[in-house]
Swiss-Prot record:
The chain crosses the membrane at residues 47-69. GO terms for molecular function: oxidoreductase activity. GO terms for biological process: mycotoxin biosynthetic process. Pathway: Mycotoxin biosynthesis. A motif (HXXHC 1) lies at residues 189-194. Glycans are attached at residue 275. This is UstYa family oxidase phomYd. It is a single-pass membrane protein.
């Protein structure tokens, strides 16, 4: 008879931490190190990204500033431009500059019999700077009034900041005690005044000297100043000539279009600075005599 034996009984106890195999401990440590490495790597990436963003922002700002300066230089140049105002022009006046195309008038023509005359202007689409007979011809009160309107109120006061900007560190030498401030006139009205003085000098029988300050030296000053202004402006508009049978030759024809600054805007600016809302007040305590009141528009002529 076969004998069956039951398996022997064995007692099992729970494993203690010290009984865990070394391979399992090393796996956990490795996972912790990997996690720590991953966190450090992510931190380094974030730092690098932030630095790149900061550097890119700085570079973008620098490029924008550089491009802005290049565009400014291209637009204005180091000395300014005819359209936006030149370096030495009054800053406040630059804001009123507008360019216009004007057709000049007044060139003489010759008839077939040799008669010289200035024809009546024909209406056209282009603006003009006034018809010829408003400013030339036999002296008259109307003629004088037309000229006076061009340079009337040409002197006005500047603020101290404007004087400093216009004339530099030595601006205080231009203080005008009698007028109570820094008195100035724009070049355009100074030049027109000079043309008017030369017009009158040609007819001393009608316009005797009204002041010893307007004698021959002043006349020479005006002539030489206009010479310099014309050369300084250097207008490059080509002026043609036309053939006339009456003189069997060509003669200059100056009635051509020119690019100009809008005169009405400039004239309005001068008037407002002279006695309008933007006029600079006299220095406190200034007592003006009648000639200076007339000069500054406080007393009518």
């Amino acid at each position: 008879m076969e004998k069956f034996f039951s398996p022997s009984r064995h007692n099992y106890a729970d494993l203690s931490p010290t009984d865990v195999p070394a391979s399992e401990e090393s796996d956990e440590a490795l996972e912790e190190k990997q996690f720590e490495y991953f966190q450090q790597r992510q931190h380094r990436r974030l730092v690098l990204v932030n630095r790149l963003l900061a550097a890119s922002t700085v570079a973008l700002v620098m490029v924008s500033l550089w491009l802005g300066w290049e565009l400014h230089t291209a637009k204005f140049g180091s000395m300014g431009s005819f359209q936006y105002g030149f370096k030495y022009e009054l800053e406040a006046a630059k804001k009123v500059i507008k360019l216009e195309e004007y057709k000049f008038l007044g060139s003489p023509i010759f008839l077939d019999d040799g008669t010289e005359l200035v024809p009546e202007p024909t209406p056209g689409p282009m603006k003009t700077l006034g018809v010829t007979d408003m400013y030339v011809g036999e002296p008259s009160k109307e003629l004088d009034w037309n000229w006076n309107q061009l340079h009337w109120g040409r002197f006005f006061l500047l603020t101290e900041d404007e004087a400093r900007q216009a004339w530099g560190p030595g601006y205080k030498e231009y203080w005008a005690e009698n007028e109570g401030g820094y008195i100035a006139g724009l070049e355009v009205t100074h030049s027109v005044h000079c043309v008017d003085m030369l017009r009158k000098a040609l007819r001393r029988d009608v316009y005797p000297l009204d002041s010893p300050l307007h004698g021959p030296i002043h006349t020479d000053h005006c002539l030489n100043h206009l010479r310099q202004m014309i050369l300084c402006q250097g207008d490059l508009t080509p002026i043609p000539s036309k053939y006339y049978r009456g003189i069997t030759d060509n003669y200059i024809f100056g009635d051509m279009p020119h690019t100009c600054r809008n005169w009405d805007s400039v004239r309005e600016f001068i008037t407002d600075r002279f006695n309008g809302s933007s006029a600079v007040p006299l220095a406190p305590g200034t007592v003006l005599s009648d000639p200076y009141k007339k000069l500054l528009g406080i007393l009518d002529e």
